[in-house]
């Protein structure tokens, strides 16, 4: 410990000795210049007195810091984390301003470590919960497909076209579930997966509507797309944004009144430096008490209790993706009258691309 202490202050010691030597030289030259004979005793006194005071000062400083430095060394050898060290140092009063700064920094690092560890643990728990829910939801299409195959083998199934249609429905559920699971896994490495680009928003939306065309026809819902006369170019990641809009369209399809010919209105508008994409349905709406929580992970609310396909992850993932792309996503709804989901793109988009 003493060796380390002296090595850390070697520069100060050397410059102090150099200063004493310089003082002796100046005194010697002054005496010689005056014509007197320098006394060895006086010269030694000039050397010994400052040297003794310097040594005494370092000794006092070492004694003052010894207990704290010994304690820190012991903590460094035994503590399991930086937060353990930080908590322990809080109970040990620093002796110097430098020690106080180091203690403050270690405490800050410990808090940062705990925060990141807690975030990681929550992500793992969330991933585990979602995986369990996903497996549970996927059991239904597996069971249905198995039953359909058995009926086909026994010759008790309905007509072949109906059989294929039912099989396609279950396959669609599989596709949607697998896509959500894949995007959940990719979200953890979002910053490495995102690819900013400029593209036509209306063309992307038309493509997604065509992709869900069969669902619109089956549920007797009619999409209408309203776009400005000029092409609307936005900067974003098209793959991730497509996932977000697909989730919003899927929710609009799922929670609209089925088979009555209601419209689902998709509207693109530009206002100054902002572009808005809204998807409005005339479905069952969201209860007021549930609206503030619809973007929380695993929250299904009152409507989720009546919808077997609800996982509580679709809108959560959509919100997370929009936040990381620098877009805003919010919902407006009136129970029994429908819901409007809106994405806002601003001129400073893609400025918050970070990992979860």
Swiss-Prot record:
SUPFAM superfamilies cross-referenced by the UniProt entry: ATPase domain of HSP90 chaperone/DNA topoisomerase II/histidine kinase (SSF55874)
Protein's GO biological process: phosphorelay signal transduction system
Topological relation to the membrane, as annotated: Multi-pass membrane protein
In-chain residues carrying the UniProt-annotated modification Phosphohistidine: 136
Function: Member of the two-component regulatory system YvcQ/YvcP. Probably activates YvcP by phosphorylation.
Domain Histidine kinase residues, every copy: 133-349
Reactions accelerated catalytically: ATP + protein L-histidine = ADP + protein N-phospho-L-histidine
Keywords: ATP-binding, Cell membrane, Kinase, Membrane, Nucleotide-binding, Phosphoprotein, Transferase, Transmembrane, Transmembrane helix, Two-component regulatory system
Recorded GO CC terms: plasma membrane
Protein name as catalogued: Sensor histidine kinase YvcQ
Disulfide bond annotation, renumbered to this chain: none
GO-annotated molecular function: ATP binding; histidine phosphotransfer kinase activity; phosphorelay sensor kinase activity
Gene3D superfamilies: Histidine kinase-like ATPase, C-terminal domain (3.30.565.10)
Primary location: membrane
Matching SMART domains: HATPase_c
Cytoplasmic-facing ranges: 1-11, 64-356
Record localization: Cell membrane
The protein's enzyme class: transferase
EC number: 2.7.13.3
CDD domains xrefs: HATPase_BceS-YxdK-YvcQ-like
Pfam families xref list: HATPase_c, HisKA
Species assigned in the record: Bacillus subtilis (strain 168)
């Amino acid at each position: 410990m003493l060796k380390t202490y002296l090595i850390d202050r070697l520069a100060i010691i050397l410059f102090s000795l150099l200063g004493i030597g310089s003082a002796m030289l100046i005194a010697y030259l002054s005496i010689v210049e005056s014509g007197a004979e320098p006394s060895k005793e006086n010269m030694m006194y000039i050397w010994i007195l400052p040297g003794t005071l310097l040594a005494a000062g370092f000794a006092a400083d070492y004694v003052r810091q010894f207990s704290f430095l010994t304690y820190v060394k012991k903590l460094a050898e035994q503590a399991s984390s930086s937060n353990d060290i930080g908590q322990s140092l809080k109970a040990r009063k620093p002796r110097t301003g430098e020690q106080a700064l180091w203690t403050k920094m270690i405490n800050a690092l410990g808090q940062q470590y705990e925060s990141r560890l807690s975030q990681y643990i929550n992500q793992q728990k969330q991933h585990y919960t979602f995986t369990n829910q996903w497996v549970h939801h996927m059991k239904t299409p597996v069971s249905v497909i198995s039953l359909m195959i058995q009926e086909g083998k026994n010759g008790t199934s309905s007509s072949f076209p109906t059989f294929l249609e039912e099989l396609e429905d279950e396959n669609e559920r599989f596709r949607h579930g697998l896509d959500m699971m894949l995007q959940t896994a990719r979200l953890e490495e979002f910053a490495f997966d995102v690819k900013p680009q400029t593209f036509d928003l209306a063309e992307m939306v038309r493509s997604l509507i065509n992709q869900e065309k069969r669902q619109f026809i089956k549920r007797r819902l009619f999409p209408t797309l309203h776009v400005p006369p000029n092409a609307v170019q936005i900067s974003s990641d098209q793959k991730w944004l497509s996932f977000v809009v697909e989730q919003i369209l899927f929710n609009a399809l799922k929670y609209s009144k089925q088979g009555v010919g209601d419209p689902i209105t998709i509207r693109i508008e530009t206002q100054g430096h902002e572009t808005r994409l809204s998807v409005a349905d005339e479905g069952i709406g969201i209860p007021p008490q549930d609206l503030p929580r619809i973007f929380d992970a695993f929250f299904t609310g009152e409507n989720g209790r009546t919808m077997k396909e609800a996982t509580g992850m679709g809108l959560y993932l959509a919100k997370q993706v929009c936040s990381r792309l620098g877009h805003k996503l919010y919902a407006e709804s009136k129970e029994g009258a429908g819901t409007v989901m809106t994405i806002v793109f601003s001129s400073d988009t893609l400025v918050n691309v970070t990992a979860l």
